[in-house]
Structures are given as structure tokens and as C-alpha cells.
Design a protein with these regions (language model features):
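Short, charged, amphipathic alpha-helical segments
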Residues: 194-197, 287, 309-314
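Mg2+-dependent prenyl diphosphate-binding active-site environment of isoprenoid biosynthetic enzymes
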Residues: 3, 9, 13, 17-252, ...
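Mobile late-domain/C-terminal helix-loop "cap" segments
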Residues: 251-300
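Charge-rich, solvent-exposed alpha-helical interaction surfaces
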Residues: 14, 271-275, 311, 334
Length: 339
């Protein structure tokens, strides 16, 4: 049996229970239908494993892991609506099957249920209040990050800092969240938990870049390769790095990025992907990933705690493994010679 399989199974049971026992059973079933499509349950794993890394029992992280997964899935439901993605995890997105209005409601329900899950965390009222505060702050960051992403191209060519700031709010907040809450559950101070969460948000940046790579050079369960690229007004790590390297391509790429999705052809997307690969953006993105990895695993907050360091290394490997085949040979050779 895989590590923490029992705890993850209990999280799954709790997720289904919270959704299906909703006052509006039809809406609860919609929320559960989305959650049950799968996913890697990374936030649940982070919650349970971080509790253990701090020396506490794994079962103390079950309800917190469910709370984090509910907020994460709420963000996915809303994200699919805003991006117009008709597929999620290889299946029809909730809005594409049941309409935008009910999908919004299902996402909102997941947010509300995340707080219901916190009520089940077996800690003192004081710690439970801290968890509620942490959840609220993460929710705010996610919404602000999503709004910033939608406006990323409206003020000109985005920098890497602009891109990272968006990810910091949208994706990274959902990686810092389970770690911060788990640290609180295990008895760490608010300051210690916050410092760990701030550092571990870099995991979210790695996983977002992974998603950017899979969108172009792999499969991320959406309706077509380049789905994010075709989405009007959406910038990725590749857009940022390509425009840094090829300023003369600004007008060409911006026309494609800001065109309505239905007006973006398969040929245009293929051309963009080819230019990203040939023009150095792929190599530049990989260099960024390696820099983030080194900064994270070598940081004082992580390296001084062996159990936590091992956990972070495990999740860094999980971020890199699905896209390792896209790593340019020159970068791979360089890592080998340094290893």
C-alpha cells in the first residue's frame, strides 16, 4: 500500500460526505462530480505529510487536507469558466456540461465547504481559528492572482516578475496553504508556519511552469495542445521568456494571444510552439525551473529540517518528472557534469 494511502482514502470519504450532505443535494452532487474526476490530490498529500514531517500523527491532517482540496477544486471550476476550457482532467468541465451559472454555484459551494472541513480538524479552538484565518488569506490571494493573470497582457509585455507575482497568488497560494496549516496543527507558531508557507509557495511556481510546459509539449487533460496559449489574454512562462529573448516578436505574438479563441488556428498555435522551442524560450524556462528548485531545497527554512527537506525534495521531483523529457540536452548535460 502506498504511503499515507489510508489517510488519503479518509480524505476522499470526507470530501464526498461534505459535498453530498449539502442542503442542496443536486448542487452538492455537481461539486462531488467535479472532485471525483480525479487529480493528484497534491494539497491533501502535502497537508498529511507535512503534519508528519513536524512529528505529529498523520490523521491530524485529514480534515485540513480535505479543506485544502475543496478550495483548490473551487478554483479549478471557476478557472475553467473564465478560460473557456471545456475539458478538465480529460472529461467535460462542469460549466460545459451543466452551464456557467450552476458551475459558479458549485465552485462557491466548495469554498464554503472548505470552512466546514476546518470545523472537523481535531485541534483547539484557538488553532482552528488560525486555520480559518489562513484559509481566508489564501482565498483572497487566489482571487487576486486570477484577476492579475487575466490582466497580465493589458499593460504591455510582462516581465518574469509580473508572471511570478500572478502565480504567487493563483497557484502558489494553494501550495503554501496546506503546509502553513499543517505546521499550525503540529504546534508550530504562526510566525514559523508563515515562513515555511512563504518559502514553499515556490513549489506552486514549479507546478505552474510544469502546467505551462504540458500545455505545449505534453498533455494536461484539456481540450487541445496549446489550450492555454489559445486563451485570449493569457500569458505563460513561455510567452514571458520568448518576448524577453525576441523583442521583435511582440506584435506577432500579442496578436495571437489577444485574438478571440475561435479565431486562433491550429497552424498558428503550432507555429508559436515551434518558435518557443527553436528560439530559446524552452531552454530559458528550464533554467528558471532549475534556479527555483535550487533556491527552494537549499533554503535555510527547509534544509535545517531533514524530514521537511525530504518532503520538499519529493514534491520537487513530482513537479519535474512529467516534463523531464522536454529538458533541452545542453541543460541536462550541464546538470550531469555538475552532479
Amino acid at each position: 500500500m502506498p504511503p499515507y494511502a489510508a489517510e488519503l482514502a479518509r480524505i476522499e470519504v470526507l470530501l464526498q460526505k461534505l459535498c453530498t450532505e449539502s442542503t442542496n443535494r443536486q448542487l452538492g452532487q455537481l461539486a462531488w462530480e467535479h472532485i471525483a474526476t480525479g487529480g493528484k490530490r497534491l494539497r491533501a498529500r502535502l497537508a498529511v505529510q507535512t503534519v508528519c514531517a513536524h512529528g505529529a500523527r498523520a490523521d491530524l491532517g485529514i480534515a485540513w487536507g480535505a479543506a485544502c482540496e475543496l478550495l483548490h477544486n473551487a478554483s479549478l471550476i471557476h478557472d475553467d469558466i473564465e478560460d473557456g476550457d471545456r475539458f478538465r482532467r480529460g472529461k467535460p468541465a462542469l460549466w460545459a456540461r451543466y452551464g456557467t451559472a450552476q458551475a459558479i454555484n458549485a465552485g462557491d459551494l466548495c469554498i464554503a465547504l472548505s470552512y466546514a472541513a476546518i470545523a472537523s480538524v481535531p485541534v483547539s479552538d484557538a488553532v482552528r481559528w488560525q486555520l480559518t484565518s489562513v484559509m481566508t488569506q489564501a482565498s483572497r490571494r487566489i482571487v487576486e492572482g486570477q484577476a492579475a493573470e487575466l490582466d497580465l497582457l493589458s499593460s504591455g509585455v510582462p516581465s518574469w516578475r509580473d508572471y511570478a507575482d500572478c502565480v504567487e497568488g493563483k497557484t502558489a497560494a494553494l501550495f503554501g496553504l496546506p503546509i502553513e496549516g499543517a505546521a499550525l496543527i503540529a504546534g508550530r507558531s504562526c510566525a514559523e508556519a508563515m515562513a515555511l508557507a512563504h518559502r514553499c509557495r515556490q513549489l506552486g511556481l514549479l507546478f505552474q511552469i510544469q502546467d505551462d510546459i504540458l500545455d505545449l509539449f505534453g498533455s494536461n487533460g484539456r481540450d487541445m495542445p496549446g489550450s492555454d496559449l489559445a486563451q485570449s489574454g493569457k500569458a505563460s512562462a513561455f510567452v514571458v521568456e520568448h518576448l524577453r529573448l525576441h523583442v521583435g516578436d511582440v506584435d506577432w505574438l500579442m496578436r495571437i494571444l489577444t485574438a478571440p479563441r475561435k479565431e486562433t488556428s491550429r497552424q498558428q498555435i503550432d507555429e508559436v510552439i515551434q518558435r518557443f522551442a527553436d528560439g530559446g524560450a524552452l531552454a530559458a524556462v528550464w533554467q528558471r525551473m532549475d534556479e527555483i528548485r535550487c533556491e527552494l531545497v537549499e533554503s535555510q527554512e527547509i534544509s535545517r529540517e531533514p524530514a521537511l527537506a525530504a518532503l520538499v525534495q519529493e514534491f520537487v521531483a513530482a513537479a519535474l518528472r512529467p516534463v523531464e523529457h522536454t529538458r533541452p540536452r545542453a541543460i541536462a548535460d550541464g546538470l550531469g557534469s555538475n552532479g
